[in-house]
C-alpha cells in the first residue's frame, strides 16, 4: 500500500501512500490578507541631495502592500499612506511576503526598529501576556527566576516566566502537568509576561508574527 495496493490487505479500500501524498491538500504558508511590515531599519541618508529621504526597511511578514495604501504605524497609531516601495534601488508598485523592501510614507512619522506598519482596519494584537508552546534548546533547564529575552520579529524585550502549564511527552503526546522541569529538547506550554507590549497574531494565522525566540541572556541559547 505504499505505491501499489497490496493483495495481502483485501479489507483495505483506501488509497496508497503515494496516491495520498500526491492528492493531499496543503494550505499555503503565505498569509496575503493581514498586512504586517515589521520595521528593521530606518534609512536617513546624510547626503545633501537625499537629506529629506526617510525610508523604512524590513521584510514583509504577511499581506500585500501597494503604493497608495492607507496604513497605520504601530504602536503609535499614527496614520499615513504608502508613497513608494523599493527593492534595492528599483521602485515597484506592489510588494509581497517575504520580500525585503524599503517603504516611504507621505507623512514624516516617527518609526523605529521593532515598530510595525499595518492596516487601520486589520491590526495585530498588542499584548504583554503570552501563552506559547516552546521547544527548549538550552543546556540549562528553563528557570522561572531568569529574565529571558523575547525576540519577536525585529523587536527584543525582557520577559519573565509566569507559569509552566505542562510538559509534552513526545512518545505518547500526554500533557504532564506535574512535571515542570523543562530541559534540553523538551516541549512545553508556558505563560510569560513581557516588559513591554508585543504586536502579535495567532500562530495558526500568521507564523511570522505568531512566533518568537526565547533567549537566555547568560548564554544566548534558545
Residue map of PLM features:
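C-terminal effector/interaction modules appended to NTPase cores
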Residues: 45-222
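Canonical P-loop GTPase G-domain recognition
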Residues: 1-34, 38-43
Amino acid at each position: 500500500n505504499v505505491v501499489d495496493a497490496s493483495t495481502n490487505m483485501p479489507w483495505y479500500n483506501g488509497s496508497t501512500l503515494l496516491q495520498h501524498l500526491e492528492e493531499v491538500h496543503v494550505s499555503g504558508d503565505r498569509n496575503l490578507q493581514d498586512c504586517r511590515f515589521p520595521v528593521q531599519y530606518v534609512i536617513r541618508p546624510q547626503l545633501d541631495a537625499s537629506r529629506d529621504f526617510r525610508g523604512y526597511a524590513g521584510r514583509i511578514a504577511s499581506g500585500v502592500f501597494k503604493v497608495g495604501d492607507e496604513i497605520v504605524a504601530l504602536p503609535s497609531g499614527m496614520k499615513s499612506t504608502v508613497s513608494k516601495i523599493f527593492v534595492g534601488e528599483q521602485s515597484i508598485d506592489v510588494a509581497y511576503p517575504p520580500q525585503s523592501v524599503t517603504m516611504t510614507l507621505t507623512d514624516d512619522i516617527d518609526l523605529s526598529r521593532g515598530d510595525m506598519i499595518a492596516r487601520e482596519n486589520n491590526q495585530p494584537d498588542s499584548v504583554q501576556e503570552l501563552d506559547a508552546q516552546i521547544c527548549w534548546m538550552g543546556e540549562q533547564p528553563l528557570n522561572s527566576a531568569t529574565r529571558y529575552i523575547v525576540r519577536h520579529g525585529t523587536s527584543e524585550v525582557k520577559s519573565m516566566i509566569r507559569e509552566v502549564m505542562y510538559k509534552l511527552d513526545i512518545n505518547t503526546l500526554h500533557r504532564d502537568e506535574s512535571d515542570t522541569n523543562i530541559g534540553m529538547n523538551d516541549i512545553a506550554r508556558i505563560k510569560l509576561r513581557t516588559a513591554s507590549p508585543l504586536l502579535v497574531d495567532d500562530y495558526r494565522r500568521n507564523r511570522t508574527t505568531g512566533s518568537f525566540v526565547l533567549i537566555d541572556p547568560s548564554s544566548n541559547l534558545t
